[in-house]
Amino acid sequence: MADPTTYRPAPGTIPTEPGVYKFRDENRRVIYVGKAKNLRSRLSNYFQDVTQLHPRTRQMVFAASSVEWTVVSSEVEALQLEYTWIKRFDPRFNVKYRDDKTYPMLAVSTGERFPRAFFFRGPRRKGVRYFGPYSHAWAVRETLDLLTRVFPMRTCSKGVFNRHESLGRPCLLGYIDKCAAPCVGRVSEEEHREIVDGFTSFMAGHTDKVTRKLNADMMAAAEELDFERAARLRDDLEAIDKVMEKQAVVLGDGTDADIIAFATDQLEAAVQVFNIRGGRIRGQRGWVVEKPGDYAGLLVDATTQPEGDAPETDPALPFLMQDFLVQFYGDAVERAETEAKEDAAVIERRGVDKHSFEEAAPVTRASVVPREILVQVAPNEAEQTLKVLEELRGAGVDARVPQRGDKRALMETVERNAKELLKQHKLKRVGDLTARSAALQELQEALDMEQAPLRIECTDISHIQGTDVVASLVVFEDGLPRKSDYRRYRVKEAAGDGHSNDVASIAEITRRRFLRHNQDKLAVPEAEEFDGSTFSDEKVEEMSTDARRFAYPPQIFIVDGGAPQVAAAQEVFDELGIVDVVLIGLAKRLEEIWLPGDPDPVILPRNSQALFLLQQIRDEAHRFAITYHRQQRSKRMRVSELDSIKGLGQSRRTELVKHFGSVAKLKEASVEDISQVKGFGPKLAEAVYEGLHASK
C-alpha cells in the first residue's frame, strides 16, 4: 500500500477548474472516481494529515498509488462524466446503487410465440417485459392468481407446454378457465396475443380502460340473456377490484411521481423509492449502501431519532441525493432504451406482433423519469442535477421538496420506511460485523500479516473417480462472499481418461488464476483518457469473466488440502513471481492450516472466529465446485445417442424426439417410419436407423 505523500501532485499543478478525478491502485485499476467544482480545493483534502481523514477515505488513499484528473467545461459535464466513469470502471470505493437481484418481479415473455406470465427474480432477460418490483413474493403470485381469472394467458413453462401439446389435452388451469389453453389450440396465436395485451395493459396502469370494457361486456351479456357469461364477467370485475384495492389511491390528482427519501448513520445510508403512477403506488424499492469517505463523517443517526421530533439534517444528504438521482435514472433510461431495441427487433422478426406492442404501454425515457420527483432534501448542485435529469427524460422535470398536504404526508411515510430499512440492516449487521472483524484480526495475527486481509480467495477440486474434474474459485471481501468474482474451471492438463491428480490439479488452477492476473496487469494502459464514449458503448461480457473485476490480488489464497497441495501451489507462486499473497492450505480432517515450507501446521482454537471464517470459505468453495461438477456430469449423462449421428443437427434431433416421444420409441421405428418425419428422406432415415442400432 502506498503512502499518499509519494504520489501527491506538486503544489500548483492541480487546476482550479471543474473536473473529474480518478484514484488508481498499484495495478492501475481505478478505485475511486469523484467530481469537483474546484479540483485543487477538493484534491488537497485527500492529502492532509491522514489521521484527520474518515477511515474509509484513509483506506482509499492508502490503497491508491496515483491520482489523475480531467478538466471539463461545466459542472453539468463533470456530473455526467463522473457517472460515465463509475459505470465504466466500477470503482470499489464508490457508492453504487445496484438493482437488488432478489426483488420479485412479474414477468411476461413477450418474445415467445405464446407469451407466458411468471414470477421472476434475477437479472433482466431479452424478450421479457417486467412489472414491479414487488416487496414480497406472495404479492406477485396473488396478483397473477387474480388476473389470470380475467386474462387467462399461459403461465406454464416451456416443458409443461410442450408436454400437454403432445398429449393433446390441457393442464388443470385449462379446465378451470384460468388458462386459454393455446397448447391444444383452444385459442389461436392472435387470440392469445389479445389476452396478453389486456394483461400487460392492465399491469402498465391502464386499469380504467379494462374495467370499462368488462362492464360494457357484462351489460351486453345481460341484455342478451347470457347470464352465465355475465356472471363470469362480474367475477372478473371483482378480481380486478381486489387487485386495485392493493393499489389504493394515495394522490387524488392522479400524479405520476417518484418519492425518494434517505435515512443515514455515521457510515451507511438507506434509501427508499416509492413509484407513484396515476396516483397509485406501483412499486417500492430500497437499498443500503456505505457512505463515500468524502462525506461520511460523525453525522446524525436517523434510526435513533425519536418519532415525531424534527431530525437534524445530515450534511451528507444533498450529496447522497445527487449521486442517487444521477445513477438511478441514468441506469433506468439505459435499461429502457435496451428494452425498446429488443422490442423493435421482435416486431421486425414477427410482424404479426406489431399491433400488440403498439397497444402496450411503451417504455420511454418519459415513463422511467417522471415529470415530478419529490425528494427529501434538494440535491447538491440542484440546478446542474436538474439539467442532467431533463436530458435523461428529454423533457422538463420538477424535482422539489414537498412542504404540505398529501405529498408531504407521503414523503414522511417514505422516510419512515427508509429508517426502518436502515434499522433492520443495522440489527442484522452488528453481530455479523463484530464477528467478521474479529475473524480478520485473528487471521492477521495467526499468519503474521502486516494488515488484516481484505480479500481472500479459495479453490477446491471436485470429481468422481477422475471423471468430470472441475475446480472452483470463490472470493470473500471483508469476510463476505463476492459472488460476482467467483470462477469455475474444467481441469484440463491434470485430469482425463478417468484419472485425476488432486495435487497437479491445484497447481494447474493456481497457475491459471495468477497467470491471468499477471497478464491483466501488463495489459492495462498507463492512462485512459475519456474519449466521449459511454459505458453502454463498450462490450462487456455477460458472465462474470470481466478481467478488470478479477484482477485485484487476494491477500490470502487458500487451497483445499494439506502440505502436498500447498507445496504445489507454492511452486507456481515461485514460477510466476507472486510474493505479495499469503498462501495457506486448510486440511479437512483436523482443520489444520498449512503454510509453505513449515513442517508443522498452525492450529487455531476450536472457538476461533478466524477458523470459523476459513471453514465458511472452504465450504463455499466446495459447494460451488460440487455444484459445477454435478452440472457437468448431468450434461454428459444427457448426451443422446442421436448426437453421434452425422448429418443430424439439433433441429432434426428435436423433430425426431417430438414425433416419436422418446429415443426408446424411435429405436422401435423402421426406416420407413422415420422417413415419414418432416425433413427426413430415405437416406437420412437409414443413417438414423443404422446409427441407433449400431450403438447397441
UniProtKB/Swiss-Prot annotation:
Gene Ontology BP term (one): SOS response
Keywords, ordered alphabetically: Cytoplasm, DNA damage, DNA excision, DNA repair, Excision nuclease, SOS response
Transmembrane segments: none
GO cellular component: a single term: cytoplasm
Pfam families, alphabetized: GIY-YIG, HHH_5, UVR, UvrC_RNaseH, UvrC_RNaseH_dom
Domain annotation UVR: ranges: 208-243
Keyword tRNA-binding in annotation: no
PROSITE patterns: GIY_YIG, UVR, UVRC
Domain spans labelled GIY-YIG: 16-95
Classification via Gene3D superfamilies: 5' to 3' exonuclease, C-terminal subdomain, GIY-YIG endonuclease, UVR domain, UvrC, RNAse H endonuclease domain
Family annotation (InterPro entries): GIY-YIG_endonuc, GIY-YIG_endonuc_sf, GIY-YIG_UvrC_Cho, Hlx-hairpin-Hlx_DNA-bd_motif, RuvA_2-like, UVR_dom, UVR_dom_sf, UvrABC_protein_C
GO MF term set: DNA binding; excinuclease ABC activity
Subcellular localization(s) per the UniProt record: Cytoplasm
Role noted for this protein: The UvrABC repair system catalyzes the recognition and processing of DNA lesions. UvrC both incises the 5' and 3' sides of the lesion. The N-terminal half is responsible for the 3' incision and the C-terminal half is responsible for the 5' incision.
NCBIfam families (alphabetical): PRK00558.1-5, uvrC
Assembly and oligomerization: Interacts with UvrB in an incision complex.
Similarity comment: Belongs to the UvrC family.
HAMAP family: UvrC
PANTHER family, sorted: UVRABC SYSTEM PROTEIN C (PTHR30562:SF1), UVRC/OXIDOREDUCTASE (PTHR30562)
Protein name: UvrABC system protein C
Source lineage: Bacteria, Bacillati, Actinomycetota, Actinomycetes, Mycobacteriales
